[in-house]
């Protein structure tokens, strides 16, 4: 389905130069002279390569229709991730590369949203937040409480993140699955 370039949004799947791309970021740029244009960062669904593309706001782009389907994470099978449809109990096997950096945040029985184009999986959405345990945290340096300085910490999944000075090793925190950043202390 054709649409104007200025209607492109992150998460959409488009076809460009005979290949399928998922849109990572889009930005409307209005230079001082001349017309506005859209700068889009996108990832090739087959190779995983990223590229930037620019279109005038009036240009048309082929947007592919995606179907969202809910699955539950089951287990790892080598370099593949096995998901299960909670309604039909059918299994879907995906390469772990489709998850990108978010792979580290997968947890047993985690609900996932898989984007399909013509039956082919093209992307996976994790829940926006996940609760993890802090395994290592640097000690607090006295005198730093006046500023909003964060300290490095290691999470139970092996991801490093920055946490406020009051967080200690052994505590559970909520982090964003998008970038691994600290949200809050877990309330459990």
Swiss-Prot record:
Record keywords: Cytoplasm included? yes
Asked whether the keyword Cytoplasm is assigned, the reply is yes
GO CC entries:
cytoplasm
Which keywords does this chain's UniProt record carry?
Cytoplasm, Elongation factor, Protein biosynthesis
Q: Which PROSITE patterns match?
A: EFP (PS01275)
Query: Where in the cell does this protein reside?
Result: Cytoplasm
Record-linked SMART domains: EFP, Elong-fact-P_C
In the record, biological process GO terms are: peptide biosynthetic process
NCBIfam families registered for this protein in UniProt: efp, PRK00529.1
Task: Write down what this protein is called.
Answer: Elongation factor P
Q: What is the lineage of its organism?
A: Bacteria, Pseudomonadati, Pseudomonadota, Alphaproteobacteria, Acetobacterales
Primary gene name: efp
């Amino acid at each position: 389905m054709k649409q104007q370039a200025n209607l492109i949004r992150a998460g959409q799947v488009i076809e460009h130069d005979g290949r399928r791309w998922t849109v990572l970021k889009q930005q409307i740029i209005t230079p001082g002279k001349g017309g506005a244009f859209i700068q889009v960062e996108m990832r090739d669904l087959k190779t995983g390569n990223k590229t930037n593309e620019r279109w005038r706001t009036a240009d048309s782009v082929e947007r592919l229709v995606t179907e969202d389907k809910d699955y539950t994470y089951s287990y790892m099978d080598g370099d593949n991730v096995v998901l299960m449809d909670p309604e039909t109990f059918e299994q879907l096997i995906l390469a772990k590369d489709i998850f990108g950096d978010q792979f580290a945040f997968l947890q047993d029985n985690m609900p996932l949203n898989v984007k399909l184009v013509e039956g082919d999986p093209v992307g996976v959405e994790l829940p926006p937040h996940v609760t993890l345990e802090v395994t290592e945290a640097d000690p607090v340096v006295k005198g730093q409480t006046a500023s909003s300085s964060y300290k490095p910490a290691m999470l139970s999944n092996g991801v490093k993140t920055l946490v406020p000075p009051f967080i200690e090793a052994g505590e559970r925190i909520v982090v964003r699955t998008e970038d691994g950043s600290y949200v809050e202390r877990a309330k459990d």
